[in-house]
Swiss-Prot record:
Belongs to the MntP (TC 9.B.29) family. It is found in: Cell inner membrane. It comes from Xylella fastidiosa (strain Temecula1 / ATCC 700964). GO terms for molecular function: manganese ion transmembrane transporter activity. This is Putative manganese efflux pump MntP.
Amino acid sequence: MSPITTLLIGIAMSTDAFAAAIGKGAAIGKPRLRDALYVAVIFGVIETATPIAGWLLGQVASHYIATFDHWIAFGLLGGLGIHMIVNGLKNNGNTCKDNADTHNRNSRWLTLAATALATSIDAAAIGISMAFLDIHIGIVAAVIGLCTFTMVIFGVMLGRVLGTFVGNRAEIVGGIILIIVGSTILYEHLSNTG
């Protein structure tokens, strides 16, 4: 596989994470670079690991996973999106910063990890498909992880601008973005099979 093809795969696999990061940045309100790096590391590590896991699973049972991966991504992203919307509606009078500060640190980590996992299901599917090609999965996974890391930093910081415009409703916007990403994954799969 050529370096250009590998880079294009990395960019394509990181677009869902980029969209989710915009929502996360909006929910944080005024994220600092440190916040963006924290989110980017979690997304980057998970996005690096999932193609490797997919590749390993592809060695064993590729068609079983490919039949339902889109439903897993849709369910996780949709559920997280609904959760964010409900929280945004409950905390109507609070600022985004207040909301971010009151969340438990472990809860934030788990939410980030679940979001990263949901957006990386497609990378796992890529890993499965690459199990049948003569490629070095470590290089492809590293490129996907680095692209995701970079795009998530930009996404979180772009979410800062979005958060300024939407104010207290930023968490709702983030939830809507996650639902759109999950629905897009499901739609793309169903439209390709129908």
